[in-house]
Amino acid sequence: IPKKIAFVQCVGSRDEKAGNLYCSRVCCMYATKEAQLIKEHNPDAEITIFYVDIRAFGKGFEEFYRRAEKEFNIKYVKGRVAEILETPAKNLIIRAENINSGELIEEEVDMVILSAGLVPAATEEIKKTLKIPVGDDGFFVTAHPKIDPVTTSLKGIFTAGVAEGPKDIPDSVAQASAAAMKASIILKG
């Protein structure tokens, strides 16, 4: 059972080199939740989360993150991981910079969990068949991301969930309800 565990946030997102400039919106809270679950099952585990910025979208998420720090002793380090190396003993060495202190960190851990950014799942075939425009980020474009995030440029075609952009499950369910309502209006004529 791994005792020292590190989470690395924003892998492949918020990164110009990777081509994904957007935040996936869910990774910080998922990592925090997983870290808490690990601590519940293994209280002696030492967990470090390396992050760029903690993004706590949603009601109660900021408190959830603070609770992880205080009650579960989960360590958060602001900084990008530069390198992960394997030791002869098959452990991993993480090299990173703590942005807040300027300190270079080299930490040996038993396990590294990468929080990879969300990417659009729409295949080229779906895009060509439906002829719905996609943005530079690859997600479907809607009438307006805040006012009307489900209506596409094609009458009767609606998006929901991560098809339109990164979001969590409650936001996806709410958006799916809105899309279903708009579709039912068309069907009722």
Tell me what each language-model feature is:
Residues I1-G189:
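Residues forming the flavin
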